[in-house]
């Protein structure tokens, strides 16, 4: 099915290429140069050749096997609208890092845009963890800082009225998550540390927090580092309005969760989080709230991980044990009142 869809996308791009790139000269070819299979979609790498050069295009084609053709059309339509909205906002403010959409391909269950060429920030973090001295050249910290600056720009460009913040609701969420994780071995001492630390941190927090468009999937895997800065290519889960700090907490938790790999230590993830948070510009009161929000995301990761269907029971048990130790360490480090 995906092969038929990409053929149709290819044909559409042949018809629209000269309108999309009026100064590129004569159209020579539109070719597929590679593809990457994902769980629910394919990413096709498309090259449009002109007399004066070439343009790279990313075509995201959703699989219809899970939710049917109508389902993938609806998903693609939502993502295409999100991408168009985000791109128009950034274009008006002369900001970069959001790919230009090249038309509405949602009837094919696809999203097509210019390609942002670069390396995922997570790959850079892993390289720094595996190669001694790699992080000493400043590239890792600079990339994390760029990610923080980009997210701050995104939230400022789409800012809305602040939302009321109720610490008791957040504490209730944490308590529920702790109960869910207790069955997998999260001990009472770690739970006490989490809840006591959270209550202490939230006692000095704000009563209103910023809101804006939120990506809901701002992770180091989705942050593409390129020569001119960073870019984000996935807008499937974006919402036009939501709590801005949710994106910040998601990023920091995703970075910290990489410590579950034995070769990725705290010195690496700490550098990334510190540089990112400094560039984002959160003050001390906001950072206290973010520490609690980050712990909520980490606990959610632990709870989700134990529900994943796994063919090998041993792998599932190993995941639970690794995450249990990691959550206990993270709680002691981040949630203790003295932290």
Q: What kind of feature is each model-predicted range?
A:
Residues 245-284, 297-314:
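Active-site activation/catalytic loop segments of kinase-like enzymes and analogous catalytic loops
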């Amino acid at each position: 099915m995906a092969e038929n869809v990409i053929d149709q996308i290819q044909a559409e791009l042949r018809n629209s290429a000269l309108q999309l790139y009026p100064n590129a000269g004569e159209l020579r070819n539109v070719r597929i140069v590679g593809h990457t299979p994902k769980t629910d979609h394919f990413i096709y790498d498309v090259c449009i050749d002109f007399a004066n050069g070439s343009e790279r295009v990313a075509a995201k084609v959703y699989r219809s096997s899970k939710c049917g053709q109508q389902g993938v059309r609806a998903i693609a339509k939502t993502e295409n609208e999100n991408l168009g909205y985000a791109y128009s906002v950034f274009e008006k403010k002369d900001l970069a890092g959001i790919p230009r959409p090249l038309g509405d391909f949602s009837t094919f269950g696809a999203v097509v845009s210019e390609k942002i060429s670069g390396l995922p920030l997570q790959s850079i973090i892993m390289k720094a963890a595996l190669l001694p001295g790699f992080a000493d050249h400043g590239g890792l910290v600079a990339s994390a800082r760029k990610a923080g600056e980009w997210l701050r720009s995104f939230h400022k460009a789409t800012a809305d009225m602040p939302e009321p913040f109720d610490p008791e609701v957040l504490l209730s969420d944490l308590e529920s998550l702790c109960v869910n994780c207790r069955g997998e071995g999260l001990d009472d001492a770690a739970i006490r540390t989490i809840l006591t630390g959270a209550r202490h941190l939230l006692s000095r927090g704000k009563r209103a927090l910023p809101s804006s468009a939120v990506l809901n999937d701002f992770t180091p895997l989705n942050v593409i580092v390129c020569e001119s800065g960073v870019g984000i290519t996935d807008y499937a889960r974006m919402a036009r309005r939501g709590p801005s700090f949710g994106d910040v907490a998601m990023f920091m938790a995703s970075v910290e969760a990489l410590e579950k790999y034995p070769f990725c230590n705290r010195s690496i993830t700490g550098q990334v989080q510190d540089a990112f948070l400094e560039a984002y510009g959160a003050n001390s009161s906001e950072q206290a709230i973010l520490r609690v929000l980050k712990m909520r995301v980490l606990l959610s990761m632990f709870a989700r991980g134990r529900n994943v269907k796994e063919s090998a029971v041993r792998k599932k048990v190993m995941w639970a044990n690794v995450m249990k130790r990691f959550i206990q360490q993270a709680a002691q480090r981040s949630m203790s009142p003295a932290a």
